[in-house]
């Protein structure tokens, strides 16, 4: 597995034509985040020994990795991160990075149950952000397998990981998705590797 980090506020090398086409019409901030994410993605492909290639955006907005690679890209306002692995070693990967700032308490009920928030052992707004990040990483890992869009209530935070509340293709009801999470003073990073 390989990872790379880029700053979305800094200029990055030019994109491939299909990557450039994907950001036509986007605002400058989103274009910079996309370019930084793809730059990080290109770096992880190089680290894995893959030939240089584009990472186009699919209709579902997910990155399209080479057929022998699984990967994920995420960004916050301060950092873009990409992680990837050869598909012979890892089934799927999901990553999420968020600035560690409290969400409005009103949003917490849309993201997590009171029991899930309690698992985070943090004030409600920070707990909601951390649950959001975990669910986002798990969503990104399961999506290439299930091809099923999920709402926040489809996955439940447990001490062992996130549990499916109902079956989706490739996962039975109760299937666990392992998620690791790290926080520091500025960022929350969640990673799900299947």
Question: What does each model-identified segment do?
Answer:
Residues 1-194:
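Core catalytic alpha/beta fold that binds nucleotide/phospho-ligands
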């Amino acid at each position: 597995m390989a990872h790379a980090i880029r700053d979305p506020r800094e200029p990055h090398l030019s994109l491939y034509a299909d990557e450039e086409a994907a950001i036509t019409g986007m605002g400058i901030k989103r274009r910079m985040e996309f370019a930084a994410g793809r730059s990080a993605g290109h770096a992880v492909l190089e680290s894995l020994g893959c030939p240089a290639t584009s990472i186009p955006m699919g209709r579902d907005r997910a990155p399209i990795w080479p057929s022998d690679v699984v990967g994920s890209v995420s960004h916050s306002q301060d950092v873009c991160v990409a992680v990837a692995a050869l598909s012979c070693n890892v089934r799927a990967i999901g990553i999420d990075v968020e600035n560690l700032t409290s969400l409005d308490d009103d949003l917490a009920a849309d993201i997590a149950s009171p029991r899930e928030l309690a698992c985070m052992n943090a004030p409600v707004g920070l707990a909601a952000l951390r649950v959001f990040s975990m669910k986002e990483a798990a969503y990104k890992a399961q999506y290439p397998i299930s091809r099923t869009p999920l709402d926040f209530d489809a996955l439940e935070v447990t001490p062992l990981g996130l549990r499916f509340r109902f079956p989706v293709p490739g996962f039975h009801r109760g299937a666990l998705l392992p998620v690791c999470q790290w926080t520091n003073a500025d960022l929350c990073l969640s990673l799900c590797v299947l």
